[in-house]
Every structure is written in C-alpha cells, then in structure tokens.
Amino acid sequence: MSRPRGLLRAGYPYLKTLGMRRVTNFPIDIAFGKDEILYVLLRESGNAFIRIWSFDDAESFTDDLVQIGSYGKNAGQFQWPVQLITNAKDEIYVSDEANHSISIFNSKGNFLSRWGKQGTQKGYFNGPAGISFDHEGNIVVVDSSNHRIQKYTNDGKFICQFGKLGDKEGEFKRPWGVHVDELGKIYVADWGNHRVQVFTNDGDFIMVIDETSIAGLKMKYPSGVAVDAHGDIYVSDWGNNRVLMFDSNGRYVWRFLGDATLSKVARSYMMTNAYSNRLREMANIEEDKYLRKPTSIRIDSKFRLCIADHMSYRLQVYQKDAIELDEHTIFSTMRNPSLTTA
C-alpha cells in the first residue's frame, strides 16, 4: 500500500471499550488475529497468559474463557511476557523478559517452539521486550537489559544487532517497544531516555522524537510504538498516562487521554451485581474514563487504534477518521507555511 500525499484529518473518535476486570486483568499487549479475533497478553505477579477475545466483546461474563499459555518456566509458559505478534498463518510469537526467550504458538494455542538464551554475547538475550516482524519476515527484538536491538530469522537464527547503552543518537537505555513499518523503518521506544528513535532496516539512525510542539508534553518512559499505513506514529507515553500521535516526519498531531465507557461484558456483569452498582453510583465516573499506564498500542487494517489500558484492566478503541489526499487535493510542501484566512 502506497502512502497518500497528505491527509484531511477529520478526527479520531472514541469507538468502544473491550474487556473488564477478571477477564482482561492487566493487559500488556494486543495482537490481531483473523475474523476479528484479538489476542490480549495479560501479566501480573504470579500470573501470565494470552486471552483470546473478540472485537465484538462478549454478551455476558462467563467462566468458560479461552486462554493460551500459563505462568511458569516450562515450554508453553510465561513468567514476565512483554509483547506478542502474529504472522500470516496466525502463529503467535511472545517475548518473555524473565525466561529470556521467544515462544511460538499456533492460532489454537498449541505450543510450537521456544528459542533464546540468556547472555550478553551476540544472539543472546537479557530481558527481551518488544518484537516486530520486518518486511522480510525476520523478527526484530528489543534486547532491553543489553540496551540493543537484535534481528533474527523467524526460527531464531541471529542476523545482526545495533545499539549500546547511552543517550546519544543510536544509543539506548532499557528500550522497550518496537515497530517495523512497511517501508522497513525501525521505531524503538527508548524507555529510559524518554524518546522514540527511528532507524533504517540496517540500523542506521534517521531521527528522534522526544517532545511535542506543546509545552509540557515531553515523553516520560514511553513503552510502546506503532505506525499505521498512513505513516502516522503512535507512542504509549506510559509515564504520562496517555498516547501521543505524530505524523511521519515526527510532528506532533494528537493525544489520547482516555474516553472509556463500560464494555458490553462489563454491563452484563453489573446487571447481576447490585453491590457493584451501588459502588459505581457513588463513584467519580469522569475519572474512570482516563488511561492508566497504557503499555501498548496497535492499529489494524481498518485504522482502529487499540490501547492496552493496563491498570484499568481493559482495552480502549478509537477509529481514525481521515481522508487520503492526492496531488489534486493538497498543495506541495511549502517552505515557509503559514495559515491565512480570506
């Protein structure tokens, strides 16, 4: 898909909330499957697994919930998982900081394989965090505690690496999230340096995004990054409880603070729980809508933005509303742009 010359940005309205406590506790990441399926990675102390959910949510709360994996050190288990991605076959790849490995499952949740060893040498991990496929099907891995980015084949053969500890261009301090766009650019959420860095597919530095055009909107511990088909860049600004949006040149465009409502499954649950309804009647409902420690963002082919609202046990979903422009509907880039009115 080629990118448009420009966009008429009509807005980015809130669409819905998915999940609830007991169903999607502490979501850390999201991946898209076929037929409107969502794979939601859940993580808390002593518990970790993937919840299979749907964009349609659920009509009612049920104990018959489908999950992949469980907590532990053995094959098919997780201790401290961070991110998950899916390929064309709907196979699921999951990084695990504590197990220093990448685990692979099929779409039905059957364990296929696991690779990775702890160490500081090339091809070894020390807390693998973000993962992303590149345009050749290789896997880019954020080797967080080794402060570097490594690339592997999809079966775990080491290809190359770049980066080291520091705060200069091309250096990292406990990086976390990563995304490779369709042009091959690598975007890294440089957690400890409070910025996002962008690189070529070979690891050459392109640019840094670390603040916006509005005072007070500097990043604080960004945990995730994603890029949509238009080239717009989204950052989960974890330490500031928000998601920031930039255009392909790193120019600030938008921020998401949270607009959550009760999900379909939560409404069904509340209608069977009189005590919870009384507590909600007494609560400050406005505060409940805001994001709390959003850890990851994902954008699907329909330009739906899904935010893992970690400390609120839910996903918040927004729908991008933008019209693609061509050479007939937008001027060429101006050297000294200014807004004028007739």
Question: What are the residue ranges of the model-derived segments?
Answer:
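Eukaryotic scaffold repeat domains enriched in small/polar residues
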Residues: 1-342
